[in-house]
Regions:
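Short, solvent-exposed alpha-helical "recognition" segments
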Residues: 75-88
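General nucleic-acid-binding
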Residues: 1-18
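Short alpha-helical "recognition helix" segments of helix-turn-helix
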Residues: 58-63, 70
């Protein structure tokens, strides 16, 4: 796994310090714009759908994501540092 950029360490630690979904929502509402939160959420949804074998066209229609976004997420799933897969696996385990 790649080492996180130094400037982001405090951010990652801050996120890890949160105890609940409510605390996380409050933090992200202060940290990000509504659009940024929507974009991040959309990417995670795209990753889940790609991981589930959905086709680009279905993902585009369901999520409203552009093919460029879908391609970028797919590239991260295939060649990235494993973050999407880690989160998707953890979400599957917690269901």
């Amino acid at each position: 796994m790649k080492q996180p950029i130094e400037e982001a360490r405090d951010l990652f630690r801050a996120i890890l310090s949160l105890d609940s979904e409510e605390e996380c929502a409050a933090f992200f509402e202060d940290l990000c714009t509504v659009k940024e939160i929507q974009d991040l959420s959309q990417r995670l949804q795209v990753a889940a759908m790609l991981n589930g074998g959905e086709k680009y066209q279905t993902i585009e229609q369901t999520t409203g994501a552009s093919t460029a976004t879908i391609s970028r997420v797919n590239k991260c799933l295939v060649y990235g540092s494993g973050g999407y897969r880690l989160v998707l696996d953890k979400q599957t385990e917690s269901k």
